[in-house]
Amino acid sequence: MRHRRALLFLTGAAVFVSALTAAAITGGYRLNLTPSEPLGLWRIEQLQRPVAIGDLVFLCPPSTAVFAEARVRGYLRRGLCAGGVAPLIKTVAALPGQRVEITDHVHIDGRSVPASSVSGTDGDGKVLLPDSGGVVPPHHLFLHSSFASSYDSRYFGPVPDSGLLSLARPVFTFHP
C-alpha cells in the first residue's frame, strides 16, 4: 500500500511537471541556464518591427563548422536549432553596413563597446580566435553579451538574421 501511494504521488508529480513545462513552452516561455544573460525565466515576444541595436533577441545560430566546434567545446547547449543547438540570447550590437573592429576589445563605427574584452583562451585554456571584423554584411547581425566569458560575435562574427526568432524579455531572472 505504501509503495502504491508513493508511485501514485511520483506519477502525479511527473505529469504535473510535464504539463507545466509544455504550457510554458507553448506559451512562449524559456528557461535560461547560461551565464551570458541573467539566469531564469524569459518570455519570447514576436518582433513587430525591424530589429534594432540594443534589442535582446533569441536567435538560432547557423549550422556551420564554427558552431559545431562550439557545441563540442560546451559553449552552446543542445537544442532545437539547426545543428542541434539551443537558441542564443544576445544583444544586437551592430546592423548591416556598420564597421566592426576587433582588437583586444570591440569597436563599432569607431566607438568602443563596453564590456567587450577579447580573450585568447576559454575557461579550459583552449585557444579562442577572435573574428576578423569588417563591415556587417546585408541580412546579418553582430551579437554581444556583456558577460566576460560569453561566446558571441567577438568570436564567431556576424550571424544571418534569418535565424532571428524573437525578442527576449526577462520575466523572473537573477544574476548568480
From Swiss-Prot:
GO BP annotation list: signal peptide processing
Keyword Transferase tagged: no
Cell compartments where the protein resides: Periplasm
Keyword presence, Signal: yes
First and last residue of the signal peptide: 1-23
Any Pfam family matching the protein: Peptidase_S26
Primary location class: periplasm
Keywords: Conjugation, Periplasm, Plasmid, Signal
Molecular function, one GO term: serine-type endopeptidase activity
One GO CC term, this protein: periplasmic space
Function: Involved in conjugal transfer of the plasmid.
Family according to the record: Belongs to the peptidase S26C family.
Protein's UniProt name: Conjugal transfer protein TraF
Organism: Agrobacterium tumefaciens (strain 15955)
